[in-house]
From Swiss-Prot:
Involved in the regulation of endoplasmic reticulum (ER)-mitochondria coupling. Negatively regulates the ER-mitochondria distance and Ca(2+) transfer from ER to mitochondria possibly implicating it in the regulation of apoptosis. May collaborate with RNF183 to restrain BIK protein levels thus regulating apoptotic signaling. Its main location: mitochondrion. This is Fetal and adult testis-expressed transcript protein homolog. The lineage of its organism: Eukaryota, Metazoa, Chordata, Craniata, Vertebrata. It is found in: Mitochondrion; Mitochondrion outer membrane; Endoplasmic reticulum membrane. The gene is Fate1. GO terms for cellular component: endoplasmic reticulum membrane; mitochondrial outer membrane. It is a single-pass membrane protein. The keyword Transmembrane applies. One of its GO terms (biological process) is apoptotic process. The chain crosses the membrane at residues 79-98. InterPro entries: FATE1 (IPR039153). It comes from Mus musculus (Mouse). Keywords: Apoptosis, Endoplasmic reticulum, Membrane, Mitochondrion, Mitochondrion outer membrane, Transmembrane, Transmembrane helix. Interacts with BIK and RNF183. Interacts with IMMT/MIC60and EMD.
């Protein structure tokens, strides 16, 4: 199939802007936080900003804890359902052979 150039869209312009601003192979989100911290510097953060960041970390950690608990619960349910399915299949096979 021959290569057909496509029309440029608004997203292409944004992508070109990002590619000029960032090194090759790196995405904007990979270095954005590090760049901000390098520009601001830790010593310039006041108590309010530190408190806001601490609360955000607590919220994120809490959400992660909830997701980990849900994952553990799901794994237990999945194992129980798989065991039930295998048991029903074995019982069905046994009944089929003995009839």
């Amino acid at each position: 199939m021959p290569w057909v150039p496509r029309e440029h869209s608004h997203d292409d312009v944004q992508l070109q802007e990002f590619s000029r601003n960032f090194p090759v192979g790196r995405f904007p989100y990979e270095c954005l936080e590090a760049d901000i911290m390098a520009k601001i510097g830790l010593e310039e953060l006041n108590g309010l900003e530190m408190e806001v960041m601490r609360r955000q970390m607590q919220m994120t950690s809490g959400r992660l804890h909830i997701l980990e608990d849900q994952d553990a619960t799901w794994c237990h349910k999945e194992a129980a359902l798989f065991t039930l399915l295998v048991s029903v299949c074995i019982a069905n096979l046994w009944l089929w052979v003995h009839w």
